[in-house]
C-alpha cells in the first residue's frame, strides 16, 4: 500500500503538458533534476474551476471538501475502510443478544430451572460466540484503521504539495499584505491537524455511528415499546453536541488564524536574529508575540464553557437513558408487554452500547472541527485565483526575442499604498542589445520598473511592451525565462553552490542534460562572474552548502554566485539591480568587466547607486519621484551639468596624495584564492546534509520521563492550581462512575431473581440511583471541560512565550546550525506547545478518569471475588497493556523520526516562500514543488510502514475485551455452577472487568497525544534550561571612557567559527581605536571585516587573544549592558511586522518623545518620505518591509541606530543601498552622529571611508595596511589599487 498516488489528469491548455502533482523527481536536492513537465496553472483537484469561484469554506463544509483530495486507489481504500468500520461497529450490539441469553441462562440456573451440567454446557456454547466476535472485530478494526491512515497520509501529502504550489503561484501584491513567514506554521500545524482528522479517527467515528445504529436496531427488535422512548435521548444529545461543535469550530478557526500571524512574526525574528541580538530587541518582539498569544488565549478560554457543555450534556443524557430504560422496562415487563428480564437487559445494554458510542464519536468530532478549521485555511489558499498566475499556460510564447522594451505612460502604486504613485506617467525605451542604466534617488521608482518588467505587478495604467507586444499578452513563465535578474540583496537557497547556480537554467533544459554538461555550464558561469576561484578554495568546492539565504557566504560571494545564476541560461534580457553593490573594488572591477562582456549581446537594464558601474552604459536614465528627468550617455550628461553631474561629483574619490613621491613598495595585485576566501570556507562548508545535522542537534529528546515532565509543568503552572485541582478532582470523581455502574448493573441484573412483587420497588430505586449518577456526571464532566481547557490555554500561552524567549536568547552559533534554521524553529514553536496543550486540556482529565476507573474496578472485582477477578483481569489486561505498550513505543519512534523529516520539509518550504521574488524570477515554482515532494517521500514512506505494523496492535487492543468476556462468562459460569459465587457477585466482577478493559483500551487511544506531548515537553524544558554561553552570561558594568584612552583594542585576536574550528578567519589581529575615532575597515570580500563587527557585537567570543573595551576585557562586561552602548547598521536591513514607529523604536527601552524620533529620521533623510505616507509613522511596514525600497529600508535602519544614541557605532556597508543624494545626506548625518562616539565602518564604497581617522586594510584575516586615506595613497599599495578601481573621472 505504499505506492505513490497516480495524479488525476488535469485540464491542459495550449497543448502544454500537465505538472505532475504527486510524483516529484527523484533528485535529492533542489535543481539536481528539474521537472520534465510544464505547469499548466490549473489546480489538480476535482471540479477545480468550480471550487475556485466558491466563497471561503467554513468548518465542516471545508472538512467535507478534503475528501475530494484522493486518487482512485484512495477511494477503494476508503470504501473498504468504511465497510470494515461499520461491520466492526456491529460487533458489540450483536454481543448484547448473546449477553441477554446469558442473563436468562443465569436466571434459570438461579431459580433452579436447569441443572449444573446443562448450565455449564450452555455457558461454554455461548462463550464461543464471544470468541468469534473477537476474531471478526480484530480483523475489521485492523482493516479500517490501516485503510483510513494510509489514505490520510497520502491525501495530506498531496495537500501539502498543492498548498505550496498555490502560494508559489500568487502575484507579488498578495505577499505585500500576506505574511510569507507564517508558511512554516501553517504547513506544519494545519497539515498535522488535517491528517489527524482524516486518519483512524474517521474509522472510529464510522464504527461509533454503526454501533449506535445497530445497537438501536437490536433494541427495537427486542422491544420497540421500550426502545422508542429511550431513543429520544439520541437526537437530544446530537443536537447539543452539534451546536457546541459548531461554536467550537468558529473559535478554533480564529485561534488558528492568530497563531499563523504569530508564526510570521517568529519567522521574521529568527530570520534576522543578529539584528534582534544587536539591538536587544528580544523583549520588545516578545511582547508583540505575547500580544498575539493573549488574543489566542482569549478565544481559547471561551472554548472552556463550550467544551464543558459538550462533554457534560453528552454523558448526562447517556446515564439518564439508562435510568429511563430500566424504570420503564420493569413497567412493561409487569404489564406483559415485554418477554423477559433478559429482553430488558438486551435493550438496556444495547442502549448502553449505543449511547456509549457517543463517547467514541464526540472526541473525533473535536478532531474533525480542528481539521475543518485547518482545511478552511488550506483550501482558501489552494482555491485562490492569482491576478498574475506564474504557472498559467495561457499567453503568447514568441519563437524569438529581439529584446526591445518600452514603457508607455506607465502609472503604478503599490497595492499596500494605493494613494502613493511610485511611477507617474513614465515613458522610456530600452533598446535591444544595449545597456540602459537607471539612476536616481531611493524611492524614485527604479526597482519598481524591474518589478514591472518581471511582471510581479501590472501598471495601473499605461503599458509595457516587449518587441511591440504588451507583456500582459505574453505567457508569464515564458517572459520571466527570457530575463536574468540579480537583485540588490541576493538570495541563495540552503543547498550547494552548484545547485544554486543551476537554478538559472530552465527546468526543461536541465532535464535534457547529463551531469557533466550541467557542471561544465555551472563552472563556466562562475568563472565569468569571478566566483570560481573562491569556490575552488572550499574543501567541497561546488558541493559546499551555502546556508539559509546564503548566510554562510560573505555578501560579495553571495552576489557573485547570484550573478553566475543569472547568466548561465544566456537570457536575452539582463536586469541588474545593484548587482555589484556588495563587491570589493577589485572583485567589482573584474565582475563589472564580465558583466560588460555578457551585456554586449543582450538587452541590459542596470540599476546602480555606485555610478562607476554605469558610465559605460549606452543610455543613462535619471529618475526622480517616479518620473524621467534626464537621459543620455555618461559624457553627454556630464556636459549638461544637470542632476547626473551633481550625483557624479558627490561620489568623487580623491586619488591625489600629499606626497606622490612616496617610495613605499606597491603591494602585488594577486591574491591566492585559497587564502583570500578562508573566511567563506569557514562559514560555509557543511559536509552534512540538513537532516543529518538535525539528528545530531536533537539528541536531547525525552531526557526526562513523561511523569517528570508533568511534575515540572504542574509546578511551573502552580498559579493555575485551582483550575488543575478542580479539573483533577472532577476527573477522579468521574473515574468512580465505572465501578458505580458495575454495582448498579449487577443489581439490575439480579433484580429479576427476586420475587415479582419486589420488581417495581427495586426498579424504581436503582433507576433513581442511575439518575443521581447522571447528575454527578453532569457536574464533573462540565468541570473537566471548562477548568482543564482554560488551564491548558493559559499554560500553552506561557510555554509558547517562554519557548520563543528561550530561542531568541540563544547565541548566534546556535542559529548557524542548519537544523536551527528559522523555518525549522518556527515549525517547532508551532507544533511543540500545541502538542503540550492537547495533553494538558481535557485529554489529561480523560486519562486520569481511565486510570482511576481501572484501579477502582480492579479493586472492586478483587474484593467481590478474587478468583474470577484474577482470571478475568490477568486474562484481559496483560495482553491489552502489552499491545498498547508496543504501539506506544512504535509511535514514539515514528514521531521522533518523522518530526525531524517534516521539520526539514517545512524549513525548505518556508525558505522558498520567503524568497518568493527569487523563485518567481527564476521560474522555480515547479522545481520547488517537485523537490518539496521529494522531501516528503521519506516521512510518508516511514509513516506508511509504521501504520501497517502499529495498527495490528491497535486492532488487538480495541477488540481484546470481547475475548475477555468469553473467558469471564465461561470461568464465572463454572464457579457459579459449583456454588462458589452467586449471580450478583458474578455480574459485579464481570461488568467491572469489562469496563476496566474498555478503560484500559481507552488509555492507549491517547498514546499519540502523550507521545507528542512528551517529546514537546522535553524540547521546551531543555531549551529553556540551556544557558547560552554568551547571551546568558553576566558581568561587570561597562567601563567609562575615562578609564582608558583606547576605546577598542584587539590583542592578538584569532577566530574560527564554531561550525569549522579548524579554519581560521582572523589571524593575530592587533589594532587600537581611540575614543571618538572614526575607523574604516576595507578589503576583499571574505577577508574578515564583518567578522570583526560580529566579535565587537559579541555574537561570538574570540578563539584566542583579547578584545578590550575602554581597557576592560569584553568577556568581563555584562553583554546586555554593553550592547546597549552600541548600534549596528548592517548591509541587509530588516524591518518587522508593525508600524514604522515601532520599527524605529526597536530595542529602545526608554520612553522616547516624538520629536526625538522625528529628528533621528530627519538625520537619516527619511522623515519627509514617512510623513508623505497617508498613515505617516503609523504606516504598517508589512512582511520584512518589502513594500519599501532598499534605500528606504536602509534609512529606516539608520534612524533606528541613531535613536539609541550609542557610544559605539558599527556600520557594515551602512550606505550600500542608498542613492548618491541619500548617501550624501545620510553620510553627513552619520558624520554628525560620529561626534563624541567611536565609529567602525565596513565599506566597499571607499568614498564613504576616505575621511576616516584611520583605515585598516584586511586580507586573508590579517591587517596588511593601515593609515589615513592620504597615507595609504602615498604607499601605492593595496588600498591605492582599490581606490583606482573606483575612480569616476572621465579617463578612468
Swiss-Prot record:
The chain crosses the membrane at residues 79-99, 128-148, 202-222, 226-246, 314-334, 344-364, 720-740, 768-788, 844-864, 866-886, 949-969, 986-1006. It is found in: Cell membrane. It is a multi-pass membrane protein. ATP binds at residues 440-447, 1083-1090. Residues 81-370, 725-1012 form the ABC transmembrane type-1 domain. Residues 405-650, 1048-1285 form the ABC transporter domain. InterPro entries: AAA+_ATPase, ABC1_TM_dom, ABC1_TM_sf, ABC_transporter-like_ATP-bd, ABC_transporter-like_CS, P-loop_NTPase, Type_1_exporter. Pfam families: ABC_membrane (PF00664), ABC_tran (PF00005). Disulfide bonds: none annotated. Keywords: ATP-binding, Cell membrane, Glycoprotein, Membrane, Nucleotide-binding, Transmembrane, Transmembrane helix, Transport. GO terms for cellular component: mitochondrial inner membrane; plasma membrane. It catalyses: itraconazole(in) + ATP + H2O = itraconazole(out) + ADP + phosphate + H(+). Glycans are attached at residues 149, 494, 820, 1009, 1031, 1052. Induction: Is slightly over-expressed in strain TIMM20092, and azole-resistant strain isolated in Switzerland. GO terms for biological process: oligopeptide export from mitochondrion. One of its GO terms (molecular function) is ABC-type oligopeptide transporter activity. Belongs to the ABC transporter superfamily. ABCB family. Multidrug resistance exporter (TC 3.A.1.201) subfamily. Pleiotropic ABC efflux transporter involved in the modulation susceptibility to itraconazole. This is ABC multidrug transporter MDR5. The lineage of its organism: Eukaryota, Fungi, Dikarya, Ascomycota, Pezizomycotina. The gene is MDR5.
